[in-house]
Amino acid sequence: GHGSAKIFKREDVVGKNVVDLLDPTRFVTTYYEEGVGFDESFGGIAQTYEECRADTTAIYLSFKKEALDIFKVPPEKQKDFTLCQILFMVNTAMKNLYFYSPETKKWSQPHSAARFAIFKALLNWGNDSVKLIKNDQNEYIVWVDPENLDGCYEAIKKLLIHLNYYKSTAQIERGKEFFLDLISVDEKWIQVRNYALTKKSRKGVFCQSVIRKTNDGKYEIDEVSNDPKTILDC
């Protein structure tokens, strides 16, 4: 994802009749001037935009048999693999609402904002393949329809096309408007965030085995438990 999307310069556009990706009836007319790139043009949202583009590319490729074959995902499990990618993304987006500050109206983590944008794209353009449901107990549930992955694909495809298009053709203002809308958090989402915070789990503690050299020059592995005292003793 990070390595994709050509940056159009003057020589790529002027006189080349490059068909506009979003409007095939016209040609591309915008490009980056010499010495100007994506980062400085898109400013403060550039990193988040790029993380979103990379994650969106990864999900898009999870729909492609050619990509899954490379990683030896069996044909009978490829649909489940793709479904797991969608479930992981929407679950992470919900949990990562923690990184949005209602006080400053800013995200503290680019990856978190990027995943939230993907989640909103699935809700907006996924043809009901992904739904956010509030039940009678005031709980929020994310529902993904395993029989409508085509809807997820169309949403991811639309998002990726727009992200690549605005970046490649230096459509700076349109790109910013498009992306800022996806990462914006209104009062409805603040309520979802508040609920997500009640489900926030404690940070995990991971403790690996310890390799020690014995007096006779050999090595042995000490298996340790994950209780605090044992970790400190190691």
Regions found by a protein language model. Name each.
Residues 1-3, 56:
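Catalytic glutamate of the conserved HExxH
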Residues 37-52, 56-166:
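Long, well-structured alpha-helical subdomains associated
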Residues 16, 25, 105, 138, ...:
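Intrinsic-disorder/low-complexity loop/linker signature
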Residues 132-234:
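Non-catalytic terminal regions of proteins
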Residues 3-50:
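Post-HEXXH active-site segment of zinc metalloproteases
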